[in-house]
Design a protein with these regions (language model features):
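Short acidic, S/G/P-rich loop/turn micro-motifs used as interaction or catalytic elements
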Residues: 185-194, 223-227
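Conserved acetyl-CoA-binding loop-helix of GNAT-fold acetyltransferases
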Residues: 189-208, 217
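Non-catalytic substrate-recognition and accessory regions of acyl/acetyltransferase enzymes
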Residues: 2-189, 209-216, 230-303
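Acidic/histidine-rich, metal-coordinating catalytic segments
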Residues: 215-225
Length: 303
C-alpha cells in the first residue's frame, strides 16, 4: 500500500489531469473556490440536503459548458479533500494499518467508479472517509458515533433491553462515543468472509485502544438479524463472534426491504415475496473491555 507521502504525490498528480484541472480553474473563476467546496464535502452526510450546495455549484459549472461526465466533479472534490486530510492523518489516533488503508483508498479516489454521483450514498460514504469521519478497516468500516437513546424503545426482546440498559449503566457508563460499523466503502464486499470480518474487528480494536473515551462497538443491520439467518443460515457466523465474546445482541423492529436484504439473494427475495421473511434490524453492542480482550487472543489476525 502507498505511504502518506506517496499518496499525496498521487493525489496532486491526479488533480493536474486536464479534465480535473479545468474544474479547479472554473471554481476559482466563478467562486466559491476549492477551499469552500472542501468545506462542503466535510459537511456531507446521508441527509440529502447536505449535498445541495455542491449540487448547485455543479449545475452552474454544467450550464457554463463544463463537461462533468464520469463523475469528474465528484472525483475532483473527493481527491482534493483527501489531499488535505493526508496532511493530518499522522495525528489521528488509529493504527498504522488503518492509515495505510486510508492511503490505499485515497489513491483510488480519482478513478472512475460506478454510480458515483452527489445523490448516491457512495458519495456520502466516500466524503466521510476523505475527511476523516469514517475509517476503512478492510471488509468493514467504522465511524465515530454512539447509541441513539431513541433506539432503546425499539429493542426486543425485553430481556435484551434489560441487558442493554445494564451494560450501558454498569460497563459503558454513557451512550458514546462508539465505533459504528458499516460494510466497507471500497466496493469489494459482495462476498462476506468470516476471517476478513474478524480482521476488520481486530483492526478496529487496536485503533479503539488508542482512543480511551470510546466505549465499544455498535452496529445495526439486517446482516445481524436472526430473521435473516432463518433464511440464510450460512450467514449466522456474522453474530457468532459477538455472542461468544460478551456482546449484547437484539433486534430493533422492521427493516426497509430496500436496505439490501433482498439484494443478490434469490432465496431471501423469494421468502419475502412468499411472506416467510419479514426483514428486521439486528443490533450489536460490544463493550470496549470485551472487544479488546478478544483482540488480545487473536494475534493471528495481525497479518
Amino acid at each position: 500500500m502507498p505511504t502518506v507521502e506517496e499518496t499525496q504525490q498521487q493525489c496532486r498528480l491526479a488533480l493536474t489531469d486536464p479534465t480535473l484541472a479545468a474544474i479547479a480553474s472554473a471554481l476559482e473563476r466563478r467562486g466559491p473556490g476549492l477551499d469552500q467546496c472542501v468545506t462542503y464535502v466535510a459537511d456531507v452526510t446521508e441527509r440529502p440536503e447536505t449535498v445541495q450546495p455542491l449540487a448547485a455549484i455543479k449545475a452552474d459549472l454544467e450550464r457554463d459548458g463544463l463537461d462533468l461526465a464520469d463523475a469528474q466533479f465528484e472525483r475532483y472534490l473527493l481527491t482534493a479533500a483527501a489531499l488535505r486530510s493526508l496532511a493530518r492523518l499522522d495525528q489521528v489516533p488509529v493504527t498504522d494499518c488503518v492509515r495505510a488503508l486510508c492511503c490505499d483508498l485515497y489513491a483510488k479516489l480519482p478513478q472512475r467508479r460506478p454510480r458515483l454521483d452527489l445523490t448516491h450514498h457512495s458519495f456520502a460514504e466516500l466524503s466521510k472517509v476523505a475527511t476523516l469521519r469514517r475509517f476503512p478497516a478492510g471488509q468493514f468500516d467504522w465511524e465515530p458515533s454512539g447509541l441513539p437513546r431513541s433506539w432503546l424503545l425499539k429493542i426486543r426482546p425485553v430481556g435484551a433491553l434489560c441487558q442493554t440498559l445494564h451494560v450501558i449503566a454498569m460497563r459503558m457508563r454513557r451512550f458514546g462515543p462508539a465505533f459504528f460499523v458499516h460494510t466497507g466503502v471500497s466496493g469489494k464486499n459482495y462476498l462476506l468472509l468470516q476471517r476478513e470480518a474478524e480482521r476488520s474487528y481486530y483492526r478496529m480494536a487496536h485503533s479503539m485502544a488508542l482512543q480511551p473515551r470510546v466505549i465499544g462497538l455498535i452496529t445495526s443491520s439486517w446482516l445481524h438479524s436472526p430473521d435473516t439467518f432463518a433464511i440464510s443460515p450460512h450467514l449466522a457466523w456474522l453474530n457468532r463472534i459477538f455472542r461468544e465474546n460478551g456482546a449484547v445482541l437484539a433486534t430493533m423492529g422492521p427493516a426497509d426491504p430496500g436496505c439490501g436484504v433482498l439484494h443478490r439473494s434469490p432465496e431471501r427475495k423469494r421468502a419475502y415475496e412468499e411472506g416467510r421473511l419479514k426483514p428486521t434490524l439486528g443490533l450489536v453492542i460490544w463493550p470496549r473491555d470485551e472487544m479488546l480482550a478478544w483482540a488480545r487472543t487473536r494475534p493471528d489476525l495481525e497479518h
